[in-house]
Structures are given as C-alpha cells and as structure tokens.
Amino acid sequence: MLILGGSLGAEPLNKLLPEALAQVAPELRPEVFHQAGKNHDEVTAERYRAAGVEAQVQPFIKDMAQAYGWADLVVCRAGALTVSELAAAGLPSMLVPLPHAIDDHQTRNAEYLAREGAAFLMPQRTTGAADLAARLTEVLMQPERLDNMAQAARRLAKPGATHDVVNICLEVAHG
C-alpha cells in the first residue's frame, strides 16, 4: 500500500494511517510505503513503530513511476494531477480530499473516481481510524475488488489528453 501526502506531507494522513493500520489484523496488513513529506518522516515512522506496524517511511519519492508500479492500493489526497496519475497507472485508491481546497475541487475529483468504482471517497472530517481500518480490512479480504477498482481506474485514464488540449487550443487560436 502506497500512502502519499505530497512533497509537504499531509499531517492528517501521517497521523491516521498508522492508527488505522494498527487496527487491521496483522495477517491482513499490507506492505506499507508512506511518503510523509519534508520534515515529517521521522515523526511518522515513530507513529508506525508505536502502533506496531511495519512501514517504510520517506520524506519524498523521487521515482513515482516505480512507486506506482509497486503499489496495489494508494491512499492519498485527490488533487487533479494525482487522480490523473492514479487513472493512468490503473491503481485503486482511497482518496482523502483536502477539506479546505478551493471550491472543494478535491472532493469533486474523488467523487468522480468513486462514482466510477475506481476509488473510495474518505472525507477527512468524517473518517476516523476505525472507519479506515474497516474499509482496508474489507478490500484486503477481497483482492478481486481491488482488481475491479484497478480496471475501473484504467478505463478512466485519458492518455491522449495533452494532445487533445493542444488541438483545441490550436483550433481556437486559428479559428
């Protein structure tokens, strides 16, 4: 399981995930690679140790393609680039939108993936460790569900989007 908090980290995720994973039965716990953000890795690693959960914690991931290739499930925020990457990589996800994002755009992004079966929307305001642990347990006991979510994510990918946008801009510019 890959946990992403962005280059600055997402402190709510850094606190929530160790606590939630501690509530998942040890035999179900996935391997954990947690990108905690600059200056948050040591505290986050200590939270995992205190919770009795093994995790590799780093401040930053230099090779996202490799990290995505390794992951079977991603827990992260729901920024536009992130959800695009999840779709392109065909990865199931649990999305915890930034609650104070402008126009609540991260929730809209997460709702899109969730509605199509590629993600679970886990609102930060209402998702506690027990809620997340229950959802994790549910999907970890049903690997076929993760496979279905991955297929749904792949269907949502728009690998030619840059080309399409350039063509639209050229059409508008040249009338």
List each language-model region with its residue ranges.
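C-terminal alpha-helical cap of glycosyltransferases
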Residues: 158-175
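Short Ser/Thr-rich beta->loop micro-motif in glycosyltransferases that lines
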Residues: 59, 77-81, 97-101
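Two-component system phosphotransfer/interaction surface
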Residues: 127-141, 170
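Acidic donor-binding loop of glycosyltransferase active sites
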Residues: 69-84, 91-92
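A short, well-ordered alpha-helix in the C-terminal region of glycosyltransferases
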Residues: 145-159
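Donor-nucleotide binding loops and adjacent catalytic segments primarily
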Residues: 1-76, 107-111, 115, 122-132
